[in-house]
Amino acid sequence: MDLAQDIADDLMIDAAQEVRIRQDLVLTALGHRPADRALRVGRLLDVHSRTWSEDQEIVFKGRRIAWVGPAGSYRGEVRERVQRPDLAAVPGFGEVHKHIESSHLTPEWEAALVLPRGNTWTCEASHEFSNVNGARNLEFWFEARRRGSPLKIFPQPGSAVPPTAYEWGGGWYGGAEQASFMRESLMVTGLDEVMDWPAVWNPDNPSYERLWGMIGATFAARGVVEGHASGLRELPEINAFAAAGLASDHEVQTPEETWDKLTRGLFIELRIYAMPEIIGWLLKKGLQDWSQIAFTTDDRSASHTLALGASDHNARVAIEAGLAPEIAIQCLTINPARHMRLTPFVGSLAPGRFGDVVLLSDVGKLEIAEVWADGAQVSEGTRYLGDVPRIAWPDWATQTINIKREIKAEDFALPAAPGRTTMQAAVIRPFHWHPEFYTFELAVRDGAVQRDESQAITKFAIVDRFSGDGLVSKMFWKGCGPRTPETALACSVAHDKHNIWAVGSSDAAMAKAVNALVAQQGGWALVREGELAATVRFEVGGLMSCRRAEALDAEMQALYAEGRKVDWMYEPTFRPRWYPGFPERLMFATLTCAPWSWVLVAPCEQAPQGFINVQTGKTHPVVW
């Protein structure tokens, strides 16, 4: 049998194709078949043993590694030889938990951004696009790879589809859907972060059966069930979380919380915000085995990646905190690959794996000179050298803001009871984790309850993007939004259901901003003093844009510049990363997962006004 015939293309991972690929790699490793390319490097890091070897050679066949060893000792024929004697080779970096949607780039352009920064494979935590178009989720994530993009994307369908039983539209996943996803592709690694903790522990929660159905379907396929344990810091809850089979947490905030979760078997995915303190503490604690720790960028935007880097930046932060560079590299490579059960394909410079290599000019500073992916060079410095597939995303990806009417100022009015000069109002703040809302007495004018600038109280709204009717829920929020008259900000990124949110000093400005978003199929819209001052286009899913990161960043910088001309209300909260100025993080203030209690969602059957306690299902009027 001539195995050289009909060797499958190796873009996707398929069991039948994998056998043929491996058969060819065996003969190539033995020197019985010619290899495509050999890369000779000054030294090479074996992440399995955390040891360096000098003057090594990596031999590629197709997109895979066929052989690794001392330079000059490979016995077979090589079509092309490349010499990099001054550089150190480490495996391509992996994102253990990332929402590519938060880069606001489509996958093909995400690849062009992150590959030069070492990121060659990503476990896509897919509950953003899946909440917009759940039926097309895997198709969306695989399309760029099928067209030749070097970035390997391993999707995890979202457990939070919908995030709670009180949210609707765009997608719905249960056990049957997850079982189908796990069967569809070996590149589906499991279930995206389980966030609705009340639905895990409480059998009376309306999402209990749906969520456990998805967990069970993932177990049945030996997939990984990712966790989200924000706010769970007491030992009973941590033990219960681990007992549920939720394998990880990327929400740790303190060293003690990290230790308690690590020692109960959770895989820890560290974000940069708490990394210096946590890593320094773990080093002082004498942690010997770092194999249960990885680094994650989670929701990093394209603008921040251009400024800081991708997961390479996280590793530099860890190294600056005292972690050995070799351990930091393991946290980007073999550790996430083991956790996601992907070691046959990624995570190390070893035969059978994809030919993903990061070439470092300075290991201690993690300075990246080149990146190779799929056995070929794809970047030099931060310049991407590869081709970007030109994808004309179809209507199912680009026509997702379904509002078939003009939104009007009166949609945001909160009518007062007849004859009243004041009304009581329920008020919350961004990242309001308190078990109760605030109550304020607000003035009535022209039959409607009014904002109160003197108390930093403005109006916040959610506009349904799915039904076609543009249903609106609205209430008063404190410590956010514009003081500038006739000013509003609206955005179609509203984690995790991704309806449209708007905050404004007037109802008319809010309507104008929302209508601008509908016209461009999502993104940002800023109305300042009655005029549309800036927009940013997220035309794919209302979450992403199909263009270069630099072009998107230029539009974002223009938005920020216009935003600096607005007087924004601000009050600090106990939630980290809520800053004065342009309130970009309101995108995340609409979350409904633990530890949130009282939230505003789009109008639903259980909460016609949209104001509901997601821990208990209790509702309350927004004014009375």
Curated annotation (Swiss-Prot):
What one GO molecular function would you report for this record? adenine deaminase activity
GO BP terms in the entry: adenine catabolic process
- Pfam families in UniProt: Adenine_deam_C, Amidohydro_1
Necessary cofactors: Mn(2+)
The record ties this protein, via SUPFAM superfamilies, to:
Composite domain of metallo-dependent hydrolases, Metallo-dependent hydrolases
InterPro entries recorded: Adenine_deam, Adenine_deam_C, Amidohydro-rel, Metal-dep_hydrolase_composite, Metal_Hydrolase
Which reaction is catalysed here? adenine + H2O + H(+) = hypoxanthine + NH4(+)
Q: What protein family does this chain belong to?
A: Belongs to the metallo-dependent hydrolases superfamily. Adenine deaminase family.
Full protein name = Adenine deaminase 1
